[in-house]
């Protein structure tokens, strides 16, 4: 009898050992078979707790008939199926784990994707990236609880950055992105066959291996390889055809989109009976401002310049670029105004002051469909600028028989200005300008072989452009027709936003 009891006890203990769950693997940090998948949106402990309360595969005939148990029983052994959906329902619609990709977690604007671990818009993505890369510090003027939404996200940078961190944006993701870009550039350099500059490198400073790399390439990057890669890239990208293509596409594809910088507001000093005409002028300029930003984005190598430098370049150049277009379009008014033959009858200083009013050109053309009459300029108090654009620019362009290619090169030279205060990538922008110089010089030699001084004559128009643009800038502040928002902020928003449909242009 005792033997039977011992035999039964042995069998019972053996059965207990067989059915006893092995939890050692759950506690073993080195065992990956029980670790959650990285792509699963459900936290591991929550998923495990949900599996624990699910009915087992052998308990389908359970007496629990609640609706919740019936739904959970559809996938009894899955921690990432209906269990994941149940967990996701606990998050608000704009939470990174909610599965919604439509709202920015920081400001509520439309999200363009998942950036640095969080669904966000292009504006908040760019703001976070700049803050981390430049290691910027902000201060809140209120109580560090400012509202950050689509309308007010730019009011307090401190609270916006804190909300980025609170919503889960990762600083290390920005650094990893920069390191990835450096590795990709090195890979492209290696694939292109080493670090020597091509025959078209700017400034004649190709370096074959060692040495510091002279000319404009010096000081760019930390080594000759990256310098030469950038030199080859600039040389390969630049051509007059590429510049003209960017200009034409911006003119034809932007439609009625505008950058609302100029407006006749309540504090404007424009005379009441003239506000309508000035307002119409502001609308035309605002449309051209939008086109100008898109034109710059498609210009060779412009997209590779740091975003802050892009804003600085555009802010310094926009008035000059606008006046260059106006002067070019207004050449037709010289014939209409009696200044045919390249401006014959002008005074020795090139002005129209000595001419009778009937012979003076009467119109400036901002584009092919909008003109500005001289009488309007007189009433607005800008007749001096009106005459300077015609006498110092339009007349000289007509005498030189300036073609569209030469105009495009002059505008590119204005855009790539390395001498602006605050520019970080000075040598890179200088390299771009040198390449435009080379394109313009080659065009002059091929199209005007007998005119050795043409290249210099074209460049001599740039100081006049600069002088007139400064006078225009003074009038903008005098008449108080600028927006309350800084122009840099408007440029930055457009540069961070996706380009309009039809303007996508691959720039290596």
UniProtKB/Swiss-Prot annotation:
Location, primary (coarse class): nucleus
The residue ranges flagged as biased composition, category Gly residues, are 192-224
Q: Zn fingers (NR C4-type): where?
A: 104-124, 140-164
Region spans: Disordered: 21-40, 55-92, 178-228
> Any idea which UniProt keywords this protein has?
DNA-binding, Metal-binding, Nucleus, Phosphoprotein, Receptor, Transcription, Transcription regulation, Zinc, Zinc-finger
UniProt subcellular location:
Nucleus
Task: Please list the residue ranges that the record marks as compositionally biased, kind Polar residues.
Answer: 24-35
Q: Which family does it belong to?
A: Belongs to the nuclear hormone receptor family. NR2 subfamily.
For domains, the record's comment is: Composed of three domains: a modulating N-terminal domain, a DNA-binding domain and a C-terminal ligand-binding domain.
Q: What is this protein called?
A: Protein ultraspiracle
Q: Per the UniProt entry, what species is this protein from, by scientific name? A: Drosophila melanogaster
């Amino acid at each position: 009898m005792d033997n039977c009891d011992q035999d039964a006890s042995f069998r019972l203990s053996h059965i207990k050992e067989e059915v006893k769950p092995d939890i050692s693997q759950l506690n073993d940090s080195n065992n990956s078979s029980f670790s959650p998948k990285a792509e699963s949106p459900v936290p591991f402990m929550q998923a495990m707790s949900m599996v624990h309360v699910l009915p087992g595969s052998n308990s389908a005939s359970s007496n629990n008939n609640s609706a919740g148990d019936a739904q959970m029983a559809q996938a009894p052994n899955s921690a990432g199926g209906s269990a994941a959906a149940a967990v996701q329902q606990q998050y608000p619609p704009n939470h990174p784990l909610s599965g919604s990709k439509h709202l920015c977690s920081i400001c509520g604007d439309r999200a363009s994707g998942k950036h640095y671990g969080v669904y966000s818009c292009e504006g908040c993505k760019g703001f976070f990236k700049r803050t981390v890369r430049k290691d910027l510090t902000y201060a809140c003027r209120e109580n560090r609880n400012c509202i950050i939404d689509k309308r007010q996200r730019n009011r307090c940078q401190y609270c916006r950055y804190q909300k980025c961190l609170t919503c889960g944006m990762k600083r290390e993701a920005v650094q990893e992105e920069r390191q990835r870009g450096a590795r990709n550039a090195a890979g492209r350099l290696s694939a292109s066959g080493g670090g020597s500059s091509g025959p078209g490198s700017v400034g004649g400073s190709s370096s074959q291996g060692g040495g510091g790399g002279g000319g404009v390439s010096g000081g760019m990057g930390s080594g000759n390889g990256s310098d030469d890669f950038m030199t080859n890239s600039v040389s390969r990208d630049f051509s007059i055809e590429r510049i003209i293509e960017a200009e034409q596409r911006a003119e034809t594809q932007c439609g009625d989109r505008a950058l609302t910088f100029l407006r006749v507001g309540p504090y404007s000093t424009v005379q009441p009976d003239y506000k309508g005409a000035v307002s119409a002028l502001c609308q035309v300029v605002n449309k051209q401002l939008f086109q100008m930003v898109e034109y710059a984005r498609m210009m060779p190598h412009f997209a590779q310049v740091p975003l802050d430098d892009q804003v600085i370049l555009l802010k310094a150049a926009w008035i000059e670029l606008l006046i260059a277009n106006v002067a070019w379009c207004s050449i037709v008014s010289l014939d209409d105004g009696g200044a045919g033959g390249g401006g014959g009858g002008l005074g020795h200083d090139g002005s129209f002051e000595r001419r009778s009013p009937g012979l003076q050109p009467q119109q400036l053309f901002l584009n092919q469909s909008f003109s500005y009459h001289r009488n309007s300029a007189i009433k607005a108090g800008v007749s001096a600028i009106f005459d300077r654009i015609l006498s110092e620019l339009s007349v000289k362009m007509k005498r030189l028989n300036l073609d569209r290619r030469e105009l495009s090169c002059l505008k590119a030279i204005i855009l790539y200005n390395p001498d602006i205060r605050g520019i970080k990538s000075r040598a890179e922008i200088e390299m771009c300008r040198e390449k435009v110089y080379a394109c313009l010089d080659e065009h002059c030699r091929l199209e005007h072989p007998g005119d050795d001084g043409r290249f210099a004559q074209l460049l001599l128009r740039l100081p006049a452009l600069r002088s007139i643009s400064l006078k225009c800038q003074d009038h903008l502040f005098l008449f108080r027709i600028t927006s309350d928002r800084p122009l840099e902020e408007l440029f930055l928003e457009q540069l961070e936003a996706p380009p309009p449909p039809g303007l996508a242009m691959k720039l290596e």
